[in-house]
Amino acid sequence: LQVDYLVLEVA
């Protein structure tokens, strides 16, 4: 999935 990087950005 490509949510890993998305979550890091939101964090």
From Swiss-Prot:
Keyword match Secreted: yes
Family: Belongs to the serpin family.
Subcellular location: Secreted
Entry keywords, A to Z: Protease inhibitor, Secreted, Serine protease inhibitor
Name of the protein in question: Alpha-2-antiplasmin
UniProt function note: Serine protease inhibitor. The major targets of this inhibitor are plasmin and trypsin, but it also inactivates matriptase-3/TMPRSS7 and chymotrypsin.
Gene behind the chain: SERPINF2
Domain of life: Eukaryota
GO biological processes: regulation of proteolysis
GO molecular function, one term: serine-type endopeptidase inhibitor activity
Organism: Struthio camelus
Summary of subunit composition and partner proteins: Forms protease inhibiting heterodimer with TMPRSS7.
A single cellular component GO annotation: extracellular region
